[in-house]
Amino acid sequence: MDEHFSLIQMACSREQGKKKPQMIAICKLTNVQRRHLRNSEEPFALTAFGMKFYVVTQAKQSAEVYKNTQTLSFEDFVQGLMRINGNNENAIKTIYAILPTDKTGFPNPQGESLGVLAQRMHAHQLYPGDNLVALQKQVQAWIGRHLDMKDISACPSASRQGSRGVEVPLYQWCSEYFIQLGQDVYFGEVLSKIDPELPANFLVFDELIWKMLYQYPKWMSSDMTVPRNKVIGSLKKYFQVPQAQRSNNSAWLINSMEDEMRALGVDDSNLAVVMFHLYLACVIMPSS
């Protein structure tokens, strides 16, 4: 029997009278759920624990959701994550303040906030052109250096080695591999020198990310917050290194986002939290 799963695109409802952003998550639809819904591909909503979840299962529906900025707000969801992970209110207010159309740095013809521009900047990094070509070359070079027996044998998850090969748990190895790949390609090797254990800590956090998404209380989520805080702490150390010493090996997106944040006066602690979400976006999809 085939296993069906879909990403659930989430947003926060702006229903009248509701001030608190509603929590959104990415979930897998199991076979049982699909059978219950009779394999319908129509979008639907679920209300659980006082929260409304909007579920879409088709790419064309996802595009419509992203365009629907009147009733669905991804900014509310993102700001909620920023608070949960340590950004203070002043930083959030600064990042989501409307910027002039003639600002320096990344073009802002529609006069949007940096919080909104960040999404456009990430898309710009992946547009066909010099930035994408540079990223692709780095990925190819990284794979060429690391996809060999010597490197695989040194993998933390390698469990048995012999004269003819090495045994690794596939899921664990793929997760470690793609997290390290995304980190090195976007942030350069300086971050690994600062904290060689960062990918391992992030993987622990990633396995428990649902506790962050569902806003578990501190006393029930220390196993998630401890590795998360380690990752954020390492990112703070990374951005305390002069940019000239790391910019040559990092992606355009990372350097440009840092420049935009510093131009607004965002301090190192808040910068690290913002970049934690960018780190999350860069490595979580390949490793999931």
Which ranges hold each PLM region?
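Active-site-adjacent bridging/hinge elements
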Residues: 149-159, 209, 261-270
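N-terminal membrane-proximal hinge/A-helix region immediately C-terminal to the signal-anchor transmembrane segment
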Residues: 1-113
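Central I-helix of cytochrome P450 enzymes
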Residues: 259-288
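Cytochrome P450
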Residues: 48-51, 132-138, 155-182, 196-199, ...
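Amphipathic alpha-helical scaffolding segments
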Residues: 64, 70-74, 192-209
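Catalytic cores of PAPS-dependent sulfotransferases
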Residues: 56-70, 111-152, 177, 182-191, ...
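Cytochrome P450 catalytic core segment centered on helix I
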Residues: 203-264
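Structured alpha-helical bundle/scaffold domains in large eukaryotic membrane-trafficking regulators
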Residues: 96, 155, 190-198, 243-254
